[in-house]
Amino acid sequence: MSASKLWSCTETVLNGGIKLFLYSSKNTKLRVAIGEVPGPMVHGAVSFVTEADSDDGLPHTLEHLVFMGSKKYPFKGVLDVIANRCLADGTNAWTDTDHTAYTLSTVGSDGFLKVLPVYINHLLTPMLTASQFATEVHHITGEGNDAGVVYSEMQDHESEMESIMDRKTKEVIYPPFNPYAVDTGGRLKNLRESCTLEKVRDYHKKFYHLSNMVVTVCGMVDHDQVLEIMNNVENEHMSTVPDHFPKPFSFALSDIKESTVHRVECPTDDASRGAVEVAWFAHSPSDLETHSSLHVLFDYLSNTSVAPLQKDFILLEDPLASSVSFHIAEGVRCDLRLNFAGVPVEKLDECAPKFFDKTVREHLEEANFDMERMGYLIDQTILNELVKLETNAPKDIMSHIIGHQLFDNEDEELFKKRTNEIDFLKKLKSEPASYWVQLVNKYFTAPSATVIGVPNEELVDKIAEEEEKRIAAQCEKLGKKGLEEAGKSLEAAILENTANHPSAELLDQLIVKDLEAFDRFPVQSLTSNSPSLTPQQSTFLAQFPFHANLHNCPTKFVEIFFLLDSSNLSIEDRSYLFLYTDLLFESPAMIDGVLTSADDVAKHFTKDLIDHSIQVGVSGLYDRFVNLRIKVGADKYPLLAKWAQIFTQGVVFDPSRIHQCAQKLAGEARDRKRDGCTVASTAVASMVYGKNTNCILFDELVLEKLHEKISKDVMKNPEAVLEKLEQVRSALFSNGVNAHFVADVDSIDPKMLSSDLWTWVQADPRFGPGHQFSAEAGENVSLELGKELLIGVGGSESSFIYQTSFLDANWNSEELIPAMIFGQYLSQCEGPLWRAIRGDGLAYGANVFVKPDRKQITLSLYRCAQPAVAYERTRDIIRKIVESGEISKAEFEGAKRSTVFEMMKREGTVSGAAKISILNNFRQTPHPFNIDLCRRIWNLTSEEMVKIGGPPLARLFDEKCFVRSIAVHPSKLNEMKKAFPGSSKIKISDLQFAC
């Protein structure tokens, strides 16, 4: 009997592009969704509806504990070991307010189908032992500190302004202990005191069973094979399905009775900026039309410089915020949030009243809606839904399936409607202004809750003092004997967790043994000199008066990456580059010889373009280049040339816009200063790269003081600032231009192809000759070897360490693959660092990254609970492995296969494959290089890995060969100075550009 005979099936096509099948078991309520997404990757998710009623973090702690082993596979981390051996890079999961989802991605379907039944076995029958709870959730160390993987993770959120405000909003709008009000991640106090193993076991029994489970698979897989696996799962676990399972979230929520305002104080190093959040209850989650309409309305109100909220709050001489954004959280009643970030502390009380009194009031009148712009926005939204089919279809499918699982009560029509949003968006375009007025009136005039996040520098020290007192009291209560017992208990837990190991026979069954021919996207990298061009390709490439590459691939869109070389910028001019790029989409411009206002420019590009952006670097690498990216439908190809000209030549710098943008960027920098990871990253970059490089100077945090100064200078002496920006433009033009086009050239009407579209480049004397750009790996690196920086960040309770050394290798070097595999061997899920650092609760993440394009090896210790101990143990483990050469064969095979996964994941979508093709031009590697690289990885021996890859790893811990940055809470500065005596204490201001 075919496996599918035991299932009923509902079929639809995701937004007209990808076939989607939803199978429902005839025996239980188990459902399996399969989306036929093309490409080499197979992505999966197993989701459960999960409801909590306390801050104990039961959904989150359970999410962590299921990975510790199952009753059938009672080996810590075996799931990730098997996943690595089956061409994955471990597994992952997330916990949300109303569901928990577990993910798996592999190259090809063979490995996916091997791992899936083992994965589900872990989910349905986890071990859930006391020793696992101790190391993974919370324990007290022999020194009296609190630790654990979950505890380390949640430390980073406890004192964040965003988290504090969110908790307050939930407290105000939901009843006490309501599932939407509690912190599903777990509060630190609860993790220490009230979260217990018994509660976790009861929680698992209640929610983790077949009738509450949906499996989603995206990729080219055999449906019968997937369903056969699920038949076996169902037969094995049928007895665990409860006779009666009350549907979670089966309650009603009352309206917010009256509008209220609440203030919460938040610890921060910079008390000049706070935040404001406004919340409302809105529609039912099954009202998909209103959901789509609100997203469009939010775009209308907030996106681009012509948007009302931009004008009312950001683009002002004296801004009220640096950014404004909307968010909808689906639930029994959808929860709308409006967030103002970077609000000057003296204006915190002005944001919400102005929103209601001006923005909302004005949009209760039909005449104030620009319906032409609204139509452009809806068209753009439709096109972006189609783009997602090429760029991120698995994520889109999983989101729809989980939404259906949570809210649609197994209604097939709602399922089809949810997965075909474009049908409704097309109808939405015909709605009159009165429709949008009704939406504004219905939701934004309803009672709301406003929460104001007030920054408080004194709280940083107060919280630190309270934590010190708490730990001191904890140590006193335990006493010397109790601390010794705590240390011994931890050691015993670690020993128990790691006592059992899978047999060689089991591991041999669960491995992909052959490197298969994956279903890759065909991409041709072509220039006008390429042999065997088709007539259409030849005509296309003959248009350009500069060097151009065509990356011909199966896409419905045309995308240009318009590159400018910034090597001629002085350090003073380069410090203006961030502002320059920000202004390109926010300024007036010459269009068809007419000076057009910034508002009308924004309106025009919303009409003409699907997407556009500007950044430094090519896919985040080769930062010397400034990269203007524009995307249109194939039927609008000529618009690429039009808008490339407008954004480069046509922009007219306006003093008022410069003032507004500079203030906005300074405000965004203040938000970034609260994040320890960001600060540590900026600090290490300051020691790795040359001072006059984009790697240093294209950073809002570094440029905060300069942007503040420019915002003032441009009002006093606009000519000087305008001259500086024009110098930046001329310097960028001086090296000419290169372009990379991503398109299916045969989908472009030949009549549209004309060299006349690009004559403006030749006509502008500022453009240098458009010779082919080249770059060297690591060309911006200028390591200050031996330097160490230690910096306090009051907005975060976690610690972060980055350590970087030089790697003398590029993509063609013999040393590269052994070093890459060695880094992956150490860092892989359930590898040496994972077990010793994350597994013992010292830090949330410990990874070694080998970066050939930057010629660097970097150690990252992320969200450390015990940073000094985590670092010392990491160093000792790596040194021991390098010196002894002792390698686990099973883990080595897993490292090779998970590295193949990383290589192939980058070309897992057609857009990703095209970006790899572009990068190959700078790496000076042929287009099929990825396949050759995978073969070389596959054939590497462990002896070669240690012999060739070991020395670069050893240099990472030679004090003469590395730089190090450490970001910690200010209360830990003295402790870290003792642990790292060679480090220099600095302030965030020391990282900033001197102006």
Curated annotation (Swiss-Prot):
InterPro entries: Metalloenz_LuxS/M16 (IPR011249), Pept_M16_N (IPR011765), Peptidase_M16_C (IPR007863). Gene3D superfamilies: Metalloenzyme, LuxS/M16 peptidase-like. PANTHER family: METALLOPROTEASE, PUTATIVE (AFU_ORTHOLOGUE AFUA_4G07610)-RELATED, PRESEQUENCE PROTEASE. It comes from Caenorhabditis elegans. It comes from the Eukaryota. This is Uncharacterized protein C05D11.1. One of its GO terms (molecular function) is metal ion binding.
